[in-house]
Amino acid sequence: MFVSTYEGAIDAKGRVSIPAPFRAALGGSSRVFVWQAPDGSGALEGGGEELMELYRETLAELPLQSPIREAIVTCIIAASAELKIDDTGRVKLPEDLCEAGELSGKIKFSGQMDSFRIWNPERFSLHQMRMRSIVTAPETLDAFASAYNRVRQRRMAAGRGGEGS
């Protein structure tokens, strides 16, 4: 799982070091997929083969001619760059993705559980402020608490415990 936030940098050749915990979350794979996040945040999103397989299975659930399926295929699958992780944990980000994310010099990596994001630090700060205003809203806390309780009840019913056990 991709968790936490890390600082990084892009060198003159467009290479970035993927944080060691993120490389571990990739399961030792030497490949990573990166695309422009489709939510308009300006971030790049990345993940491994497991995430792409999950997307493939999810897309197979949608009708072949579905506009939603086509949009996801176009904006994520077709727009993904498949990158090789070198022996030092670096990848070379394509220039078009660096431009789309306004990435140069310092960058931020943020874990998104199943995926991770690569951010321009200023964009990341703005995003954090927006997300903090959303997460503190009573309706957000209520929705999360309800979902949490449903998951916890399912886990307990399955004999897996309630609090992260």
From Swiss-Prot:
Ranges where the SpoVT-AbrB domain occurs: 5-51, 80-123
Domain of life: Bacteria
Compartment annotation: Cytoplasm, Nucleoid
Keywords: Cytoplasm, DNA-binding, Repeat, Transcription, Transcription regulation
InterPro entries: MraZ, MraZ_C, MraZ_dom, MraZ_N, MraZ_sf, SpoVT-AbrB_dom, SpoVT-AbrB_sf
Listed SUPFAM superfamilies: AbrB/MazE/MraZ-like (SSF89447)
GO molecular function, one term: transcription cis-regulatory region binding
Family the entry assigns: Belongs to the MraZ family.
Subunit structure: Forms oligomers.
Record's protein name: Transcriptional regulator MraZ
Species: Hyphomonas neptunium (strain ATCC 15444)
Lineage of the species this protein comes from: Bacteria, Pseudomonadati, Pseudomonadota, Alphaproteobacteria, Hyphomonadales
Gene: mraZ
